[in-house]
């Protein structure tokens, strides 16, 4: 290191210490949720098992993306009106509901509905979680976003690995665990009540 420059580890520690308690509390439910947030590929695979051809599975993926794009502006507007923490909590609940539904879903129409709702959930997860972080950490937004991506990124991999292992026993086990962890994340979120700014 150049003279006068802090050691990288010291810089990371200092950045972490400067982050607000509210943001650090938010990492708890975010981490629990990430443990159950496995790849969309499992949903696509389940749709194929139900009877969708590979071409139809691609169309389901397109439906998911289209729903996400259409709903995203509405989700953002709703977050501004009712508070982003409520929308984040709604996202956790939507993912729990999706996975519970997948435990019992066995028809094509149910799968179509699932992928529409998944698009709504994804719009919430991709936009409102990050917007909520910006509310909590307006001055250290980049540092907070990096910490959030680091923590959740570490947990996404084991989430898919565990889901894959459970899938070999029964797809219902994988979806059931994801639903349970999503509900647990909701409970932790309500318990720790991470604080946000005026939009809250």
Regions found by a protein language model. Name each.
Residues 65-73, 153-157:
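Residue-level signature of mid-helix packing/kink "hotspots" within the transmembrane helices
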Residues 1, 176-200:
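Multi-pass alpha-helical transporter architecture, strongest
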Residues 23-60:
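Helix-loop boundary and gating motifs at the non-cytosolic
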Residues 124-137:
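Intracellular juxtamembrane helix-capping segments at the cytosolic ends
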Residues 103-114:
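Helix-loop junctions at membrane interfaces in 12-TM secondary transporters
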Residues 1-29:
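Juxtamembrane intracellular "pre-TM" segments in multi-pass secondary transporters
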Residues 71-83, 167:
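Helix-to-loop junctions at the C-terminal end of transmembrane segments
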Residues 86-101:
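Structural signature of the two symmetry-related core transmembrane helices
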């Amino acid at each position: 290191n150049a003279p006068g420059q802090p050691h990288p580890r010291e810089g990371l520690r200092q950045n972490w210490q400067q982050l607000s308690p509210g943001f650090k509390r938010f990492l708890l439910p975010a981490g629990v949720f990430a443990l159950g947030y496995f790849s969309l590929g499992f949903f696509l695979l389940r749709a194929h098992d139900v009877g969708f051809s590979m071409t139809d599975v691609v169309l389901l993926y397109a439906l998911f993306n289209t729903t996400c794009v259409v709903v995203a502006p509405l989700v953002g507007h709703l977050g501004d009106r009712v508070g982003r923490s409520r929308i984040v909590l709604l996202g956790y609940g939507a993912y729990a509901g999706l996975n519970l539904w997948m435990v019992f879903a066995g028809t094509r129409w149910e799968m179509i509905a699932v992928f529409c709702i998944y698009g709504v959930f994804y719009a919430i997860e991709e936009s409102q979680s990050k917007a909520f972080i910006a509310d909590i950490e307006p001055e250290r937004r980049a540092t907070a976003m990096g910490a959030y991506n680091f923590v959740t990124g570490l947990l996404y991999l084991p989430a898919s690995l565990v889901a894959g292992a459970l899938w070999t026993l029964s797809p219902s086990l994988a979806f059931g665990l994801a639903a349970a962890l999503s509900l647990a994340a909701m409970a932790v979120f309500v318990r720790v009540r991470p604080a946000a700014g005026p939009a809250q």
